[in-house]
């Protein structure tokens, strides 16, 4: 459950280390984002020679949440922290590698590239 001002780790090789959610996309009154939702983020911490710089604003898709996501069979998939993957204007991943597991809920037409790059799909 990600809301405005939430800090997230970055699960790709763009050079960003941590980001902060500045907007949850999908409606003017929408407050929370879960796995698979697109948010606007500001880069808060970045590697010196990465693709992105501190202070830049990007779209990102949430790939892991500590709150977890409930499946149809009643199971709950939780993670130790919150993580996102940075996207460009066409909602394609900027990085070429994904670190850590992602959930099966990302397996939609929009985010198949992220699922194929991920080392593990839960």
UniProtKB/Swiss-Prot annotation:
Q: For this chain's UniProt record, which GO biological process terms are given?
A: translation
A single GO molecular function term of this UniProt record: large ribosomal subunit rRNA binding
Q: Which SUPFAM superfamilies match?
A: Ribosomal protein L14
Record keywords: Ribosomal protein included? yes
UniProt keyword RNA-binding, yes or no: yes
* Assigned keywords, A-Z: Ribonucleoprotein, Ribosomal protein, RNA-binding, rRNA-binding
Pfam families in the record: Ribosomal_L14
InterPro entries, from UniProt? Ribosomal_uL14, Ribosomal_uL14_bac-type, Ribosomal_uL14_CS, Ribosomal_uL14_sf
A cellular component annotation (GO) from this entry: cytosolic large ribosomal subunit
Gene3D superfamilies found in the cross-reference section: Ribosomal protein L14
Task: Give the family from UniProt.
Answer: Belongs to the universal ribosomal protein uL14 family.
Assembly and interaction partners: Part of the 50S ribosomal subunit. Forms a cluster with proteins L3 and L19. In the 70S ribosome, L14 and L19 interact and together make contacts with the 16S rRNA in bridges B5 and B8.
Q: What's the stated role of this polypeptide?
A: Binds to 23S rRNA. Forms part of two intersubunit bridges in the 70S ribosome.
Q: What's the protein name?
A: Large ribosomal subunit protein uL14
> Which species is listed as the source?
Polaromonas naphthalenivorans (strain CJ2)
- Give me the gene this protein comes from: rplN
